[in-house]
């Protein structure tokens, strides 16, 4: 009888000890996100849809080693940053960032903003940029996660200057796009009061 009681107590201790590990392993926020995106150049007039799995836990593990889950959600972010097919026409630029907004909201992000180039005709050195932020928790601490989506399709011939090289030094056209993205991120952080 004594052995049974000890065995039951050991089983109970083992089961109870697994509860914190199970709770820590799953943040409980895993969700399927429907991402709409523009595909093709003039071949169609609608956005496509793909699903991705999002969880804040994607950002509590190291990004220094390849992780399929993070790669897939990163692709979803890149897709969402494309301008919606609805914005192809000059009278409909206001919908340019709607796919990014939808994805960010589904993932629980707030402070969703886009630069002016998401809403007006492109220029040779313009680049559309979207940002959103949210607070995530890891190891008992709170951190601000900022999603930055740079438009990579259905961009109305923007960033054409990317092919411009300089006689010496860095790739001038690429540097112009890089600087716009970093400047917009800095202004987003300041505007939203993120520290």
List PLM regions with ranges.
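Hydrophobic core
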Residues: 10-18
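A conserved cap/lid and substrate-binding interface adjacent to the catalytic center
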Residues: 99-194
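Positively charged n-region of N-terminal signal peptides that target proteins for export
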Residues: 1-5, 9
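Sec-dependent signal peptide cleavage junction
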Residues: 18-29
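Charged, compositionally biased non-catalytic regions
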Residues: 32-109
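Short stretches within intrinsically disordered, low-complexity N-terminal or propeptide regions
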Residues: 23-24, 80, 106, 134
């Amino acid at each position: 009888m004594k052995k049974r009681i000890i065995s039951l107590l050991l089983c109970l201790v083992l089961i109870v000890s697994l509860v914190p590990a199970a709770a820590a392993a799953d943040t409980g926020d895993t969700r399927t996100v429907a991402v709409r995106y523009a595909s093709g150049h003039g071949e169609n007039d609608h956005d496509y849809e793909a699903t991705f799995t999002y969880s804040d836990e994607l950002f509590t593990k190291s990004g220094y080693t390849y992780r399929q889950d993070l790669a897939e959600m990163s692709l979803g972010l890149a897709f969402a940053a494309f301008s919606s097919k609805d914005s192809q026409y000059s009278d409909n630029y206001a919908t340019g960032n709607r796919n990014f907004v939808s994805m960010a909201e589904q993932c629980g992000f707030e402070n969703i903003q886009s630069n002016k180039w998401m809403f007006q005709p492109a220029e040779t050195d313009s680049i559309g940029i979207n940002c959103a932020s949210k607070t995530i928790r890891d190891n008992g601490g709170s951190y601000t996660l900022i999603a930055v989506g740079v438009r990579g399709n259905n961009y109305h011939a923007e960033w054409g200057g990317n092919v411009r090289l300089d006689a010496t030094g860095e790739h001038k056209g690429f540097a112009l796009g890089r600087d716009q993205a970093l400047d917009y991120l800095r202004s987003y952080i300041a505007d939203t009061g993120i520290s």
